[in-house]
Amino acid sequence: MKEFLAYIIKNLVDRPEEVRIKEVQGTHTIIYELSVAKPDIGKIIGKEGRTIKAIRTLLVSVASRNNVRVSLEIMEEK
């Protein structure tokens, strides 16, 4: 699932080499922490959050087939 997420994100951004995805696994939950270049954050979120919502919907759909819960968080660099 991490590779699937990476494929989607890298095709949306201008700097795919700066995409970082950290996977944190719990008992029945997987949390993906996404870091992208600062100028690409807007592309990931999309207008009114539509793009990130669509990505999360796809992840939840794939995860439900495997009986796990999934969460996607965008990490902001300081």
Swiss-Prot record:
Chief location of this protein within or outside the cell: cytoplasm
SUPFAM superfamilies: Prokaryotic type KH domain (KH-domain type II)
Record localization: Cytoplasm
CDD domains tied to this protein: KH-II_YlqC-like (cd22533)
Family (UniProt): Belongs to the KhpA RNA-binding protein family.
HAMAP family assigned: KhpA
Its job: A probable RNA-binding protein.
Protein name: RNA-binding protein KhpA
Organism of provenance: Chlamydia pneumoniae
